[in-house]
Amino acid sequence: MDQEGNEALSLLKACEKKYPTSPEEAKLEVFENKYSSRDYEIEFDCPEFTSLCPVTSQPDFGAITIRYIADKLCVESKSLKLYLYSFRNHNSFHEEVVNMILTDFLEIAKPRWIEVVGKFRPRGGIAINVKATHGEK
């Protein structure tokens, strides 16, 4: 595989075990989409997402699915893993988490279309599912 143009992917080659402690500290990295002339869908399935309840600070568990059609840039998966991990000690409502992820993807990758779905485990007998989208598919 051609490595040219991937020098900016600092997290992929790093063996360091210092993880970001908040979404604001985390860094999504991107690489050039060599097939930007066509529409194709990229899907990240992240079944082990955790964050904290903003009221009780108890852990919330869920699955995050991110589907997008890239334009000129694609999000690198290790940076996404570390970014999502950074929510582990972050106090947020589920709706806020999903929209935050969507906003951060839009800012860094500028996809043609994106959908972020959060399916959260029941707390108090109620499961919460949140879907946020942007753009035309």
What are these model-derived regions, one by one?
Residues 1-137:
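N-terminal intrinsically disordered, cationic/polar leader segments
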